[in-house]
From Swiss-Prot:
Function summary: Rescues stalled ribosomes. Can hydrolyze peptidyl-tRNA on ribosomes stalled by both non-stop mRNAs and mRNAs that contain rare codon clusters or ribosomes stalled in the middle of mRNA. First identified as a complementary ribosome rescue system when the stalled ribosome cannot be rescued by the SsrA(tmRNA)-SmpB quality control system or the alternative ribosome-rescue factor A (arfA).
Subcellular location: Cytoplasm
Subunit and interaction comment: Associated with 70S ribosomes and polysomes.
Keywords: Cytoplasm, Hydrolase, Translation regulation
Organism, as annotated: Escherichia coli (strain K12)
GO CC annotation terms, alphabetical: cytoplasm
Domain description: The unstructured C-terminal region is required for ribosome binding and peptidyl-tRNA hydrolase activity. The C-terminal tail functions as a sensor to discriminate between stalled and actively translating ribosomes by binding in the mRNA entry channel downstream of the A site between the head and shoulder of the 30S subunit. This allows the N-terminal globular domain to sample different conformations, so that its conserved GGQ motif is optimally positioned in the peptidyltransferase center (PTC) to catalyze the hydrolysis of peptidyl-tRNA.
SUPFAM superfamilies to which the protein is assigned, alphabetical: Release factor
Name of the protein described by the UniProt record: Peptidyl-tRNA hydrolase ArfB
UniProt cross-references to PROSITE patterns, sorted A to Z: RF_PROK_I
GO molecular function: peptidyl-tRNA hydrolase activity; ribosome binding; translation release factor activity
Class of this enzyme: hydrolase
Start and end residues of each stretch annotated as Disordered: 100-140
Amino acid sequence: MIVISRHVAIPDGELEITAIRAQGAGGQHVNKTSTAIHLRFDIRASSLPEYYKERLLAASHHLISSDGVIVIKAQEYRSQELNREAALARLVAMIKELTTEKKARRPTRPTRASKERRLASKAQKSSVKAMRGKVRSGRE
C-alpha cells in the first residue's frame, strides 16, 4: 500500500513493477543484473478518487502517456530495492504535485526603497555614459 495522503492510498496490485537491465556505466554488473525498475500506473483503472484522476489526466506531464498511464523508469542506484523505492517516491511526489491547488499570486507593488535603488542605478549608468563623450575645455 503506497500512501499518498491521509485519505488516499494506492494498493500494490494497481502498480505494475518490472525489473529491467539498467543502462550506462557499470561494466559486467550492469550488463548481467536487472537492477533498473520500470513502474507503470494506469490512472483510469486505479482506485484514486475522481478528483485525483481528473487532475492527473488533465495535466500535460512528460511521464503521463496519451492513454493515461504513468511510466517511471528508475536506474540511479546499483540496487534493485533502492531503485524500487526511488520509483515509488517519484510517483508519490508527482501525484502530490499535480493534485495540490496552487496558491493564487497576490499582486504587490514595488517598495519605495526598490524604486530608489532603481533610479540611483539609472542615474549612475547615465553619468557613466555621459563621461564617454569627448572632453571639452572650458575656454571655448
